């Protein structure tokens, strides 16, 4: 991100979301989000991917909350560094804990869907962990733990 001006990055991001991400947003994924919305659940995406890339994805799903790795900015330009704690592995748990504390909420009746073995620290803390479109290693671990394994095509 640091090598290009903001206008170029935003243009590329728009094209990326339109051509690569939008086709991956399946009716099944949208229906799952809508089920949680209808239940009155707090909707949150938590991802290791940076917020510059993931904010439009959260917006496309109508998910109002996003915890993502934050790219450092200086005078409107990305520096190539990370600001704060990256939301990766245990950092994801740390960032979520801070977010929950700030909102006076907790993980009671929480649901978390992941396709990554890197999310085991968070999967093991929520009430309802789900492995989604998981690779063989995560799927095997999820089955061993008794967690549901979903394929959302």
Q: Model-predicted segments: where are they?
A:
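Helix-loop "lid/cap" segments that line or gate small-molecule binding pockets
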Residues: 1
């Amino acid at each position: 991100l640091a090598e290009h001006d903001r206008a170029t990055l935003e243009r590329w991001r728009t094209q990326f979301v339109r051509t690569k991400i939008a086709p991956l947003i399946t009716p099944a994924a949208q229906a799952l989000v809508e089920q949680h919305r209808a239940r009155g659940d707090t909707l949150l995406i938590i991802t290791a991917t940076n917020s510059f890339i993931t904010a439009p994805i959260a917006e496309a799903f109508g998910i109002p909350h996003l915890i993502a790795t934050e790219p450092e900015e200086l005078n409107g330009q990305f520096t190539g560094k990370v600001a704060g704690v990256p939301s990766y592995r245990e950092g994801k748990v740390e960032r979520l804990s801070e977010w929950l504390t700030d909102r006076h909420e907790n993980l009671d009746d929480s649901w978390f869907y992941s396709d990554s073995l890197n999310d085991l620290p968070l999967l093991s803390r929520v009430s309802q962990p789900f492995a989604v479109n998981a690779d063989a290693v995560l799927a095997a671990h999820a089955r061993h733990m008794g967690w549901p394994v979903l394929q959302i095509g």
